[in-house]
Amino acid sequence: MCIRHRSFDGHTAAVDALASGAAAVVTQDRLGLENELRVADSRSAYARLCAALCNHPERKLRMIGVTGTNGKTTVTTLIRNILSDSGTKTLLTGTVCNRLGDENLPSGLTTPKPPELYSLLSRAVSQGCKACVMEASSQALAQGRLEGIDFDAAVFTNITRDHLDYHGTFENYVSAKKKLFEHSALSIVNLDDPRANEIIAASKGKIITFSTVLDCADYTAKNISLLSDCVRFELVSKGHIEHIEFASPGLFSVSNAMAAAVCAVNLGIEPKDAAQSLAKSKSVCGRLERVECSAPYSVIIDYAHTPDGLEQVLRALRPSCRGKLIVLFGCGGDRDKTKRPLMGAAACKYADKIIVTSDNPRSEDPIKIIGDILKGTDKKRRDLFVEPDRRKAIVLALKTAEPGDTVLLAGKGHEKYQLIGGEKLPLDERETVRKILGLPHDTGRKKQ
């Protein structure tokens, strides 16, 4: 397969491939080779070929895709839980892990590449799965990894700036997201998002909307209670009222729970069954995850790595914070640089103490990344600290925290490593916190 990548054009290897024994090459460009099979889009052809070689397992499953800047992991997990609790064995693919029934499998990419994806789907079919819930990333959609899949349902959570290092412009980013809804029988759309109408316009199937504020939506949330450890609300549609509780704070948790419930109900699940499943669902690993410790302050780990994501998490934690709200965060290297000062500004607006550190600097100088973040902050603040070493930054956060404070470790979430230079170094923030506090090793997180 001759695929044009950002740093390498596979067409340049076509002659060598034939010389090495390949029977033919599939190309997007005319190369003038004898055994050349030309296609309009080699990425699309690659995905479709992988599907065919695995005997099209995607046609034997109810395919549900979830896309958006924030909330994908939580929403897919909740949908998977609802379907599983209703007796439908379900494959979950996403950022944190791939889960086949009750078996956790490692996850490399948010959305697997075609060979891995169809191998996983084929395995799911052979083991009796009837549905697949997957996170559909913008890169996967732009690269055509999901070409040829007719989704039974597609869910839109929200869209804010992210991945501009890959897409170039925000409009390109939005356009990539819209692709999911062009091939879905059902579109579940968050009407609270400013770009919702664009998603609706791109949708080819039935459209169902939900909102936390707009009565014109098909499903609305009423009598919302934002508590320190959960949200409660009434899911209202055509006169039917279902009481929902989900163990995660913040208004965005209402939106996530709504997205999952609305999707499940429109796939045939009874509203009361969806509500019961949500009520017993735990927070997802690395998403507003509370570290169990004996400290007189709270320690929260969250994957927030965008300006909007960081703002939403800080706002969610504020009501339950009796003391100072302390945030520790950095920004990824070799990624969208324009969001760095915006992350700094969000932290300054909503946190009482800020510790700027490293995330995954990759090939960039961590000090340069931190400098970009600081451009969005008030450098005169006495409660703004810089510590490039993330472990040392966590020590600083915990050693200076006082009773009643809330410490948010943002950006890493479920990740248990740091990418520094060309190395992947171990860093489990849960264990780091426990070690600093002199606590024993955690034997494992409870099942979600």
Model segments located where?
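N-terminal leader/targeting and accessory segments in enzymes
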Residues: 1-48, 52, 194, 220-225, ...
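Short, structured coil segments at secondary-structure junctions
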Residues: 21, 32-34, 149-150, 183, ...
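Short, polar loop motifs at secondary-structure junctions
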Residues: 22-32, 94-97, 191-195, 212-213, ...
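Short loop/edge segments at beta-strand edges and connector loops
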Residues: 27-28, 40, 94, 136, ...
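Phosphate-binding loop of NTP-binding sites
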Residues: 46-191, 195-206, 258, 267, ...
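Adenine nucleotide phosphate-binding catalytic loops in nucleotide-utilizing enzymes
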Residues: 167-174, 201-311
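ATP-dependent carboxylate-amine ligase
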Residues: 204, 259-272, 276-448
